């Protein structure tokens, strides 16, 4: 395959679509991803047209996926839709019914192996939902799914009398002195507790491990984070790079 061939990577999420153009070569993992965002697949026509291959991941988003399939067929550009697998890229999935593991989690687990400084690591994705996935060696051991910061806050406001909040997104954890702050800080504390519990599980298995944090909510815990925390904004796209060589 020519080193000049282009591939378009797509992470089709709930809020927006992340895209990155890469040159297909063995050195692609060493190069930084230049990521752009849009909210509709239809806006990607020119990027697709300029590519020799499209590699995409989507959790749900059926209409967007159908449109992507149609565009790629029209422009005669091969499309690979990543799926969770029982075993791939030397990683074994913990789920018996592996197809029910979100492909975003699967790709993040695969990508994190290239980042982690240790054999054991956990991937924390902070978003609408917070997820945790634990890996030792080439084995995904499973994980957790919990409400994310905004979901917790909205649920408190909706289901609890005389509790209210604002749209502030705290980047430090302090004690609230009014209800608004108590709600925001309490939800932030819950996120921190989620990560703390994940670390406890890691310590039960390995003395040395890495915590890799991704997702839009990572700003909540970046300040004063321990040295063994590694932050990455685009783990799903990084995981999609593996599909360029299958």
Swiss-Prot record:
Which reaction equations make up its catalytic activity?
A: (R)-pantothenate + ATP = (R)-4'-phosphopantothenate + ADP + H(+)
Q: How is the cofactor bound?
A: A monovalent cation. Ammonium or potassium.
Asked if the Swiss-Prot or TrEMBL record annotates the protein with the keyword Metal-binding, the reply is: yes
What organism is listed for this UniProt entry? Pseudoalteromonas atlantica (strain T6c / ATCC BAA-1087)
InterPro entries named among the record's database cross-references: ATPase_NBD, Type_III_PanK
Give the cofactors, semicolon-separated. NH4(+); K(+)
The top EC class is: transferase
GO biological process terms, alphabetically, are: coenzyme A biosynthetic process
Spell out the family assignment given in the record's similarity comment: Belongs to the type III pantothenate kinase family.
Residues that bind ATP: 11-18, 128
Which residues participate directly in catalysis? 104
**Binding residue positions for K(+):** 125
Protein name stated in the entry = Type III pantothenate kinase
Which SUPFAM superfamilies does this chain map to? Actin-like ATPase domain (SSF53067)
Q: Which residues cross the membrane?
A: none
Q: Which Gene3D superfamilies match?
A: 3.30.420.40
Per the record, its GO cellular-component terms are: cytoplasm
For the ligand (substrate), the binding residues are 95, 102-105, 179
Q: Where in the cell is it found?
A: Cytoplasm
Provide the assembly information.
Homodimer.
């Amino acid at each position: 395959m020519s080193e000049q061939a282009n591939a378009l990577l797509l992470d089709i999420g709930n809020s927006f679509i992340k895209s990155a153009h890469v040159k297909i070569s063995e050195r692609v993992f060493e190069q930084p991803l230049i990521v752009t965002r849009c909210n509709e697949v239809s806006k990607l026509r020119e990027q697709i047209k300029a590519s020799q291959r499209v590699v995409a991941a989507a959790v749900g988003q059926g209409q967007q996926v159908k449109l992507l399939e149609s565009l790629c067929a029209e422009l005669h550009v091969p499309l690979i839709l990543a799926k969770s697998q029982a075993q791939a890229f030397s990683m074994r999935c913990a789920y018996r019914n592996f197809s029910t593991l979100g492909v975003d989690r699967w790709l993040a687990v695969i990508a994190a192996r290239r980042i982690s400084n240790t054999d054991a690591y956990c991937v924390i994705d902070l978003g609408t939902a917070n997820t945790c996935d634990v890996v030792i060696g080439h084995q995904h051991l499973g994980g957790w799914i919990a409400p994310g910061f905004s979901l917790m806050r909205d649920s408190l406001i909706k289901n609890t009398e005389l509790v209210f909040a604002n749209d502030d997104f705290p980047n430090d954890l302090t004690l609230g002195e009014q209800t608004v702050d108590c709600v925001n800080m309490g939800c932030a504390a819950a996120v921190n507790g989620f990560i703390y519990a994940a670390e406890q599980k890691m310590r039960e298995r390995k003395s040395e491990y890495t915590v890799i944090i991704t997702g839009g909510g990572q700003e909540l815990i970046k300040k004063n984070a321990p040295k063994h925390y590694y932050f990455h904004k685009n783990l799903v796209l990084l995981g999609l790079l593996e599909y360029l060589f299958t």
